[in-house]
Amino acid sequence: MSTINSYMMNGKGNSMDKVRRVERMVAMTKLLVDSPQKLIPLNYFCDFFGMAKSTVSEDLTCVRQSMEHFQLGTLETVAGVAGGVRFIPHRKGTQANDILRDVQARLMEPDRIIPGGFIYMSDILYDWHVMTRLGEIIMTRFMDRNPDYILTVETKGIPLAVMVARAFNKPLVIARRDSKVTEGSAISINYVTGSSGRIQTMTLTKRAIPPNARVLIIDDFMKAGGTAKGLKELVLEMSGIVVGTGVLVATAEPNPK
């Protein structure tokens, strides 16, 4: 049985005395990466490892330097009684560009073109390895907008929106095509889809977004922007604030959206 497992079972900090620094840092990294943007008090690590705060701070500094060196994100320290440390999953620079180029190459495969001029994307949208990284890239692009909620519409935009919400550590809200009795009173709007030019309905429960909430809209595909405009109207009907719109793929035409 590993030393860390023994510690967790015994609940005693002194059993961690034999744990090497590299083992502590691996465990710290796992705990932080599993909860993006969640503020974890330093005392939590002190109790978990049975170490002094100064030692924990030194370990966290090494973790931060390593993450930044390899462009895997960074650690943000918040001072004060209610402070702590949180992992910010930045994806930018060379790593972000490599990820986007890989996705672009897959989308440009000739056999992806389907009748109607559409691109088959489902295998990419449901690839969690890809969606996790794209979610972190989008989070990095919109981090300065400080959204309170991530909003999408069912169904294909959900996987990407889930990973954006995870990267931000913010609630995900999903607009439906029809209202559900189990969700209480709702607001519904009609909008014109850009892909087919048909009038469709989307609905959102009134409890989903409070007034003055900052909302980031996420979707998988944009042609004329009808769906995004519909989502924006829903947010405005609920007295929310749209801080941005992020999509995985947007057609060149029509322009503007």
Task: Show where each model-derived region lies.
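PRPP-associated nucleotide enzymes
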Residues: 3-217, 224-257
